[in-house]
Amino acid sequence: MLYLAYGMNTNQEAMASGCPKAKPLGGFYLPNHRLVFRGYADFEQNSNYILPVVMWEITDDCLKELNKLEDYPRLYNRTKINERRFWIYNMNDQSGTKSPSDDYYRMIEQGYKDFALDEYQLRVARHEAA
């Protein structure tokens, strides 16, 4: 199954620790979505943006671990997008923004570097959450 990561799980080291059997398939951009921070990474629909993501091939065991990591279903909801081909998590509470911790931000920043994703939206999302 396929999973799209846009936050901490863009980082290869972080993903390997929780889902060692996950296989990275590369960095991509999801149209009509933008990155936001609500303390943790989230996304929202916006036709003026594209969301940098990393696609992973994951196992059933990995999906269970991701559910724990994302505090599903309390903090994050899990849905399938793009004709139900990809799993992606988004926050249940879509209200407001909040800056991420420096460590969390650096972890995502490294993930963007790992997959040569454009860091502009990452910086904008952090600035807007401040």
Language-model regions, residue ranges each:
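Glycine-aromatic micro-motifs
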Residues: 1-130
